[in-house]
């Protein structure tokens, strides 16, 4: 089976040995959970409960809003508390609702009966279940999964790609899921394929996950109605990028401004497939996820099942806290390449919290923002083949008109350019700011036209 190699990228130290291969762990029940209302790209859902309402685990607490939106459900049985502002994982304060836990009695809401005969269930019903259970992407922008499974009629999709690459250093939550829940992931993938009306499923996993590869290959047999191929990928960052993975597995290129569906593919992470399986076959909304808690300062790094809304402080305490001789320099939600540094221990876990990473002071890179040396490393290793050096200068000088022409919106924010830069320029931060400014300008222009 041919594997295509994308241009650019590099090979950072992975540090996955800190958490890989350990048993899954759970967080003890907490007295309170704080559920952020807007957890995905698009609009926030609308709160549909009030203070004092009794809820069960999985009870709807915020209904789907307009546009790209998904509902939210209670992570535990208990009572609805206050609507509050809490630190958000991407900086700033965000709106959230408190759930005060019933410490004596926990049970699932039974609003969604299991669909055991999903093969004979209409596509409309399956898609509605995925939507009503709030399934999203389990990293990045947490894109609503039901939207991914609804390509326009004019888009001809023939292949579903399951993303098990997990190329981000330190993170092993997908690896753990594939080792221990391979069959559930692939059945969830088969449900997605049925919704899309296709039979071809291709799974991409990097070769540094041999146990996951073996488990997924063994589980791929005997699932009727689909043809599943598991492919071994070379270790290279960012192999798990949607466009890079698609090219590696199929040889199809997604041009700037296009989507995977434009070349006949839909890409879904293995964690989302597991959530689809849980929603359809068990009737469980997405209210918890497996997250890698890791880093050299952490006493007991590993992969933990965390309820949505659990505070960072409780997660770290359950992982044994910080080693006595360590000085934590940074706490990151996600991985070291694409994650976001946190400034508060009160920030809650969200649906896209793939990792919680602690770095020692000695491990934190310092970006000086010095002048570009014109060495060309960033251009050579950019997986999107962008003119990084000139693009960074344009963004730094707030020439967003030039940045737009140089395709800043195509930037993955993967961090390769900043990592290889000998001048330690904060390129990614420049690009993030530019993209935010351009988005706001576009929004203002649309409002003017109304």
Where do the PLM segments sit?
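N-terminal, Lys/Arg-enriched amphipathic/low-complexity engagement segments
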Residues: 1-48, 98
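Short histidine-centered loop motifs in beta-beta connectors
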Residues: 45-54, 58
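Short hydrophobic beta/alpha edge segments that flank linear recognition/processing sites
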Residues: 55-69, 84-87, 94-101
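Conserved hydrophobic positions within beta-strands
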Residues: 78-80
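Hydrophobic alpha-helical hairpins/lids featuring a short glycine-rich hinge
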Residues: 91, 98-162
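Gly-rich Lys/Arg/Thr-decorated short loops/hinges at beta-loop-alpha junctions or inter-strand turns
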Residues: 107-108, 160-174, 297
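Hydrophobic alpha-helical positions that pack around
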Residues: 198-312, 318-323, 335
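Ferredoxin-type iron-sulfur electron-transfer modules in oxidoreductases and energy-metabolism complexes
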Residues: 353-369, 379, 383-450
């Amino acid at each position: 089976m041919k594997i295509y190699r994308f241009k650019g990228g590099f090979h950072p130290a992975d540090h996955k040995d800190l958490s890989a291969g350990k048993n899954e762990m759970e967080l003890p029940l907490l007295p309170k959970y704080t559920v952020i209302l807007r957890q995905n790209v698009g609009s926030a859902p609308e709160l549909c409960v009030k203070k004092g309402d009794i809820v069960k685990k999985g009870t709807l607490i915020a209904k789907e809003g307009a546009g790209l939106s998904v509902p939210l459900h209670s992570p535990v049985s208990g009572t609805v508390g206050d609507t509050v502002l809490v630190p958000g994982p991407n900086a700033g304060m965000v709106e959230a609702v408190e759930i005060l836990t019933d410490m004596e009695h926990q049970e699932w809401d039974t609003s969604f009966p299991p669909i055991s005969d999903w093969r004979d269930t209409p596509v409309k019903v399956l898609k509605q279940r995925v939507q009503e259970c709030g399934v999203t992407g389990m990293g990045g922008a947490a894109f609503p999964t039901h939207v991914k499974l609804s390509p326009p009629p004019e888009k001809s999709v023939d292949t579903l790609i399951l993303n098990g690459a997990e190329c981000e250093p330190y993170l092993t939550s997908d690896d753990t899921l594939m080792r221990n829940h391979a069959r559930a992931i692939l059945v969830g993938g088969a449900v997605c394929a049925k919704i899309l009306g296709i039979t071809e499923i291709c799974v991409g996993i990097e070769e540094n996950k041999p146990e996951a590869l073996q488990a997924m290959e063994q589980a791929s047999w005997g699932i009727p109605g689909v043809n599943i191929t598991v492919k071994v990928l070379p270790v290279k960052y960012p192999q798990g990028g949607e466009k890079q993975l698609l090219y590696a597995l199929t040889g199809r290129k997604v041009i700037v401004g296009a989507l995977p569906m434009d070349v006949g593919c839909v890409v879904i992470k293995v964690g989302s497939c597991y959530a689809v399986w849980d929603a359809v076959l068990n009737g469980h909304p997405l209210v918890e996820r497996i997250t890698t808690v890791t880093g050299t300062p952490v006493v007991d790094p590993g992969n933990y099942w965390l309820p949505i809304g659990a505070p960072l402080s409780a997660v770290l305490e359950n992982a044994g806290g910080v080693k006595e001789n360590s000085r934590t320099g940074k706490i990151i939600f996600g991985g070291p390449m694409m994650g976001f540094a946190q400034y508060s221990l009160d920030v809650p876990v969200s649906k896209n919290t793939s990792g919680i990473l602690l770095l020692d002071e000695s491990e934190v890179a310092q970006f000086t923002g010095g002048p570009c040396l014109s060495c060309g490393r960033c251009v050579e290793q950019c997986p999107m083949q962008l003119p990084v050096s000139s693009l960074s200068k344009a963004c730094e000088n707030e020439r967003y008109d030039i940045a737009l022409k140089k395709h800043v919106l195509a930037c993955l924010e993967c961090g390769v350019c900043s990592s290889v830069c000998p001048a330690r320029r904060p390129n990614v931060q420049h690009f993030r700011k530019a993209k935010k400014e351009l988005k706001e300008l576009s929004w203002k222009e649309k409002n003017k036209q109304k």
